[in-house]
Amino acid sequence: MKTLKALKIFIIVYISSVSLESFAGFGESCSNLPITSDGYLETYTAYGYIIRSIDMKDPRGNCNPYTSSITFCFKNVEGSTSPCTIYTLNEGDARKISDLSTDNNPNLGANTVLKNIVLTVKKFGNDLCLAMPTSRGPMPVACKSLNATPAPTNPKYENCNIGKSCYTGANYSQSLINFSGLAVQCLSETLNKIFFTGNSCSSQDQNSRITHLAAFSTFQGYLKRIIGAALILYTMFFAFNMALNKEYATTEKITLFIIKFLFVVYFSIGLEPLNFSGGQTVKENGMLKYGLPLLTGAAPDFAEMIFNAAGSRGLCQFDNSKYKDGYKFYGLWDAIDCRIGYYLGLDLLYNIDKNGILGHSVGNGPGGNNKPIPNFDPDSKKDRPHDLSKAGALRFFTVMFGFLMSGHIIILVAGIAFSVIFLSILLYFITHYLVCMITIYVMTYISPIFIPMVLFTRTKAYFDGWVKVCISCALQPAVVAGFIALLITMYDSAIFKNCEFLRYDYEKGDIRFSTFELRLPSIDADKCQESFGYKMLKYYAGEGWEEHLLILFPIKSIVRDVVSILAELLCVLVFSVIFYYFSKSIGRFAADLTNGPNMDAVTASPTKIVDLVKKGAAFLQDASSVHAQGKSPVEDKPDIGSKRKDGVQQGEDSENSSGGELADLASGSGGGKL
């Protein structure tokens, strides 16, 4: 009897364990789920947690590809009699987490963050999936195939309104610090998606409360239909004129009409269907196929030629052959981003990879020799500040603080002025390029309206104006880029003189990047060692620092090579001031040269930051002068009274004097001139 009871208990425990094991495969889906390139959604967001709370494969039969519904098991609270609850939903059904988790589970249905998330059944290619909204668009948490041999298509995971490169664009750059190239590519793909290819946003949200407006591409499609109808009427009127008037029946006019008509049709409404980059079927349009790439690619091509023709020997010169097809324009922006980091002492751009953490080195670039710099080991410097050992630190400002602690205010002011002017001018170029690119996309979008105007004499002036704006916006960034290339060339020569740079190429997966290490030239190496850039790199490595007490606290400052550093930095500052004043008129110069609109009104002013600093200094100076005037000694009051009495007797002279003082006070309180 006892043996039979023990056998029953063993069987019950075994069945329960098998049941629990059969439902323990949470996170399993009938078909593979898409994985984001960075793994962010699966690891750090609620999306990954919801995936690990759903089981599809157990119990068996949920992966049937011939049913139009999806069956899944949603996790219950720990300690429940059943590990999960089974639900079956059809395509288009939507349920909140709180509706699926009804057992007061604090991690799901009772969680204030997760309970209002809506799960919707929808198709992703050949899969029927249970999807949830994420920051990168709807993403599936459980899927099953609708046929026996599903096509290997992965659903898009990027935001429906934003280009994919906004998330993965940094992978196409060869510079460890990259933001300008990423901004350009992100904006380009986003504009392309908004204006031409359309987006993947549904017309209504999941609650069916908000109806989104039609995409720009839809509106342009209707616009092209109207233009096509107008062109048909134009052809009919030309045929009537040719039939009624023999002057229109000449071979010359007919040939000219055919050429102009084909030109207008091809560049305005397009010919023949074509798969565009977004995968949507559209007509082949001359403006999209030839005009837009030509207009947007003129600036980086022109500037890259100037960059390669000058500059320091090997500094921030990347291998163009390693850029992927369609992303070679990153070479210009990588050169700019790299110099920003190098001038400001970002150590990630310097070859500090002793332990191989950056990836596998695949070789060295041309320029520079392989002889290491003597006495340039940062690990042997004990007196250096702790901030110099932090990865990714901008060491330039740490060194400037060291000069401040040693009392060299002029070096600090000159260094800050150089960095502010340099960053202001580069920010102006980036914003100018982006504004011109947006203008080109807008002009391309409305091209179906302006291109047909070339057919009529009365409207041809509008077409000429449209062409002028397009060409000007394509050439203006090229002119400004030439100015930036000249600026950087002068900086390289003034900061590093004849120093050489050795490039280290690395690969980590599909990502390729490079670092640069300063090398002494084989001829006239003393000139390189006396340069401002070489001495700054020595300060970055910890040389030239001394520790002393300030009251009761130990501080670290720089007291070596102060005179030579000041002379070299003032030389760099002279170039900065020259380009600062020239940058005020570069926008107007580019507009006059290209006979187009001036973009300075909608771009970041190259002198904006400096002007704000000047206004702040003027305000502080005027405030201090007013404060000093308000503290007049008490014994001076009788003199003030006598002055007022004399002022009444003098009449007009007193009024003029008082008016002048009031004017000075008003200008002081308003932040007057220095």
Swiss-Prot record:
It is found in: Cell membrane. Residues 1-24 form the signal peptide. Residues 363-384, 624-674 are annotated as: Disordered. Residues 633-647 have a biased composition (Basic and acidic residues). Coiled coil: none annotated. GO terms for biological process: protein secretion by the type IV secretion system. Keywords: Cell membrane, Membrane, Signal, Transmembrane, Transmembrane helix. One of its GO terms (cellular component) is plasma membrane. It is a multi-pass membrane protein. Pfam families: TrbL. The chain crosses the membrane at residues 226-246, 254-274, 409-429, 436-456, 469-489, 562-582. It comes from the Bacteria. Belongs to the TrbL/VirB6 family. This is Uncharacterized protein RT0031.
